[in-house]
């Protein structure tokens, strides 16, 4: 989405980012989310404001000057779905040791989807639905 509206997205140098990562909103609020990707926003579009970042991803969440936002994590992944992805990708994307370590992280971390659902609700309630271009 960032690329579509004039930003820049590039493939990361190195391995994919897979696991549970901590993000920090511009107001200081922190949250954990599931990540599984190689690509990253390296320059946000002029029509977007950065609203969250992480130690590995400077532009983790963008809010646009129209009713939309984009994220560099997977708010749609449930814990069970993410575990299935990890197991299916064991030895392909991560070594067995990395997969087991990531599964252990998932057991310890609380990943809430509430903040994302709240943002979607705000976008749909504050703006007419036909003005919402996309929520990714």
Segments the model singles out, each with a brief description of its role:
Residues 1-25, 32:
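Cysteine-nucleophile active-site neighborhood
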Residues 10, 24-136:
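Amide-donor transfer/coupling interface in amidating biosynthetic enzymes
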